[in-house]
Amino acid sequence: MSTDQLTAAASRVPPKQRRSPRVPRPSARVLLLFAIIAALITVWEATVTLTKTNEIILPKPSSIFLALVDGFSAPVTSRASYFPHIRQTMSEVLAGYVVGSAAGLGLATISVRFALVEYLLRPFVVALQSMPKIALAPLLIVWFGFGFNSKFALVILATFFPLFVNGIAGFKSVEEGPLRMMQSFGASAWQIFSKVTFPTALPYIFAGLEIGMVHAITSAVAAEFLGGQLGLGVEIIIMEQTLDVPGIFSVLMILAFIGWLMSVLLGYLRRRIVYWAPVERARADAR
């Protein structure tokens, strides 16, 4: 067989398909996650028990669980119940998160539409963001008191910046080709924004929402550290004064769960709305 015949025959042999790495199914991944968590809790419990570590230093997971049971089983009207504190903190977080995100995204839209607005606003926004939010809390308490309003205002300030910056970056990420095509068809400014600019910016906006969510929780709790009657941050300070370390850990577990739950909800919305984004397609293929 000649060299040409060998080459032709080789060209007809289908190339070996590369095997993609096997990704565990969602149910298997969930089981693996729970197994890791259970193993860590077991090691933690055994270590504290065997070393006889003082629970003021590091409480056992069983003690933290009992603190959670006590907090959730106490009458809702009592001071020991966790429910009033969760309701207070969540109202501060959600209200400030919605208003701050809407304000940041709204001003980002205006700034992209009018370059002068962005030029004038950006120095003030960056200067405000450079200030630690906890440093603004005492001033907000002087202005608005120890109640809901001061925490609400601080959460707005904390969530505004991620949406403002990410919104501008997303709106400016639109390529010239689609814009010129829409303009050539005589599309209005609103049609271009709603059909091209805003959908293109959605991955950036969701990234800003995820960052803002973390800032909302941390800023609300930090403001509650400085004063108030209700809130998970207030509860942590009271427990710190009584050396109730298992109680402090239990409140931290609640905050971690709240953050995880909000992240899951945002992730679900992102997958439903921005399913066409390359990152979401890659995640869908991995499943």
Each language-model region and where it sits:
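Transmembrane alpha-helical segments of polytopic membrane transport and secretion proteins
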Residues: 1-37, 264-287
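Periplasmic/extracellular loop-to-transmembrane helix junction in inner-membrane transport proteins
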Residues: 22, 50-98
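Hydrophobic alpha-helical elements at and bordering transmembrane segments
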Residues: 82-86, 90, 120-127, 167, ...
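Transmembrane-helix boundary motif in ABC transporter permease subunits
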Residues: 95-125
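Generic hydrophobic transmembrane alpha-helix motif, especially the helices
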Residues: 126-162, 169-170
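Transmembrane alpha-helices
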Residues: 153, 157, 190-223, 250, ...
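Short cytoplasmic-facing helical segments at TM-TM junctions of multi-pass membrane proteins
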Residues: 163-209, 232, 236
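Hydrophobic alpha-helical transmembrane segments of polytopic membrane proteins
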Residues: 233-270
